[in-house]
Amino acid sequence: MKIRPLHDRVLVKRQEVESKSAGGIVLTGSAAGKSTRGTVTAIGKGRVLDNGQIKPLDVKVGDTVIFNEGYGAKTEKINTEELLLLTESDILAIVE
């Protein structure tokens, strides 16, 4: 199955979180937490402005991003991968 985001939506594959603490202790389960970094796997065409024009997104496929998993974030499981469907405004930064 393939997902094609609409408008200003972005599909992100969450990166694995580091499973060791700074002191070398292996973290498991909820102690490890969830990463707020991921790789953009698909994007919509852009945000529709009030005048009807489409503003292209600032992110592109392959970008590593830091995101805020807020109220509007949707989690989708495709095959064995867990993907997040976010709006571009949920993305806080592009990691360069």
UniProtKB/Swiss-Prot annotation:
Q: Does Lipid metabolism show up as a keyword for this record?
A: no
Q: What keywords sit in the KW lines?
A: Chaperone, Cytoplasm
- Where does this one sit in the cell? Cytoplasm
GO terms in the biological process aspect are: chaperone cofactor-dependent protein refolding
InterPro entries given for it?
Chaperonin_GroES, Chaperonin_GroES_sf, Chaprnonin_Cpn10_CS, GroES-like_sf
Question: Could you describe the subunit structure of this protein?
Answer: Heptamer of 7 subunits arranged in a ring. Interacts with the chaperonin GroEL.
Q: Any idea what this protein is called? A: Co-chaperonin GroES
